[in-house]
Amino acid sequence: MKLIFAGTPEFAAQALQGIVNAGHEVALVLTQPDRPAGRGMALQPSAVKKVALTHGIEVFQPLTLKDAEAQARIAAVGAEIMVVAAYGLILPQVVLDMPRFGCINIHGSLLPRWRGAAPIQRALLAGDAETGVCIMQMEAGLDTGPVLLRGAFPIAATDTTATLHDRLAELGARLVVEALGKLPLPAEPQPADGVTYAQKIEKAEAMIDWSKSAAELDRHIRAFNPFPGAQALFRGQTVKLWQASPVAGRGETGAILAVDKNSIIIACGEGALAVTELQKAGGKRLPVQQFLAGHPLAVGDRFDIPA
């Protein structure tokens, strides 16, 4: 099937690779412009662009799809369908209507739950028992289109955004290839009940509030791993917490209840948190024993409570 692929990050790159491996004709790839990255801030291509170039696929990197020139470039391809995955640009209705089978989107949640930009993080923060991928027929609304295929799996107690991302990307690649092989597929309208929105993650959200329960803070730490990293303040200095688990314990919120070579136990609004991996500002992620060697902490010390 002749198609256009629109996507940018690694989540989308896996889908593109799967589509190519399945033998479909990817006539054009749309992706975000190269961005400065790394210590030297040199321009870096997106993960999708790297895959496209590896396979000799033409790449188009417009700043917007609203101008006539970009729309003409897309129309000239004569694609039967456009596959979209974490692209980053709004597709105007004229673009949605161009391909014979329209545009389909690979969305990393079980719609209608967690429409929007950050479904993985929001599912973890909310304590959802499962997540998955929907292949959705796109329309003008935000992730409101009917669902063609869906797949689900349970969220483990140790899952982070990083681990869920990888599992969802793999599932999304498999489902979109299945969908392309079965078109046209019956479309299931999304129910009106159960709609939630996954707002974009803001860095300020990563700050830990010790008045919350240990279970909530465990989810918080896992949701913000790898970006931007859950943050706590200790004597005014930022410390990132990367791994922790809820344990029994009571004390003044933010107070250190116990310290050993394996963990630091910190009192929460309900229960306590056993932290096992930390990072000081400008430093590396370290297990507790190595962290304590350079940054001693003692029972009775207290993490700052955000204002």
From Swiss-Prot:
What CDD domains does the database record attribute to this sequence? FMT_core_Met-tRNA-FMT_N (cd08646), Met_tRNA_FMT_C (cd08704)
Q: Which reaction does it catalyse?
A: L-methionyl-tRNA(fMet) + (6R)-10-formyltetrahydrofolate = N-formyl-L-methionyl-tRNA(fMet) + (6S)-5,6,7,8-tetrahydrofolate + H(+)
Give the matching PROSITE patterns. Answer: GART
Q: Where does (6S)-5,6,7,8-tetrahydrofolate bind?
A: 109-112
Q: Which GO terms describe its cellular component?
A: cytosol
Q: What EC number(s) would the UniProt record show? A: 2.1.2.9
Principal EC category: transferase
Q: Which domain of life is it from?
A: Bacteria
Annotated Gene Ontology MF terms? methionyl-tRNA formyltransferase activity
Name the InterPro entries for this protein.
Fmt, Formyl_trans_C, Formyl_trans_C_sf, Formyl_transf_N, Formyl_transf_N_sf, Formyl_transferase-like_C_sf, GART_AS, Met-tRNA-FMT_C
Q: Which Pfam families match?
A: Formyl_trans_C, Formyl_trans_N
The answer to whether UniProt assigns keyword Isomerase to this entry is no
What family is this?
Answer: Belongs to the Fmt family.
What is the protein's known function? Attaches a formyl group to the free amino group of methionyl-tRNA(fMet). The formyl group appears to play a dual role in the initiator identity of N-formylmethionyl-tRNA by promoting its recognition by IF2 and preventing the misappropriation of this tRNA by the elongation apparatus.
Q: What is this protein called?
A: Methionyl-tRNA formyltransferase
From which organism does this entry originate? Answer: Dechloromonas aromatica (strain RCB)
Instruction: Cite the source lineage.
Output: Bacteria, Pseudomonadati, Pseudomonadota, Betaproteobacteria, Rhodocyclales
